[in-house]
């Protein structure tokens, strides 16, 4: 997301792998009027007005589009405050988080090798 300040941008993920084009259209054509001329600090009001004004409320296309915009606004706000977003949202609550990795390969041996690489990276603790 671009701002009126040169070089100040925000990044957000609006991934909807089955329908990327409608998400782009939702951002460009539907959400843009809710964003233009607004202050980054108005994140909650932007979200609420965008969400409740929509005919497609709670649908996957709008939810993905709005999620990406919301993330980008928080990214911009963090840059303006010179703080990581997690500090803006209350601070770090843990040193690490569980992750899921998927080993793949053309042969069973390749899968085993990739799994060993993930284990060596520390992605498996043996706990759930």
Spans of model-derived segments:
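Metal- or metallocofactor-binding catalytic centers and their adjacent structured scaffolds
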Residues: 4-80
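N-terminal amphipathic alpha-helix/helix-capping segment at the start of soluble metabolic enzymes
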Residues: 50, 78-79, 83-96
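Metal-dependent enolase-superfamily TIM-barrel catalytic cores that perform enediolate-based chemistry
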Residues: 90, 95-128
């Amino acid at each position: 997301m671009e701002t009126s300040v040169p070089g100040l941008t925000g990044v957000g993920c609006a991934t909807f792998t089955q329908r990327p084009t409608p998400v782009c259209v939702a951002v460009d054509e539907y959400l843009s009027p809710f964003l233009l001329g607004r202050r980054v600090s108005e994140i909650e009001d932007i979200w609420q007005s965008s969400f409740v004004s929509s005919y497609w409320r709670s649908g996957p296309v709008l939810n993905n589009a709005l999620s990406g915009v919301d993330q980008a606004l928080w990214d911009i706000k963090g840059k303006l405050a010179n703080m990581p977003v997690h500090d803006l949202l209350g601070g770090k609550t843990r040193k690490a988080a569980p992750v899921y990795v998927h080993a793949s390969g053309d042969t069973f041996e390749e899968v085993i090798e990739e799994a060993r690489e993930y284990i060596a990276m520390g992605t498996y603790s043996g706990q759930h």
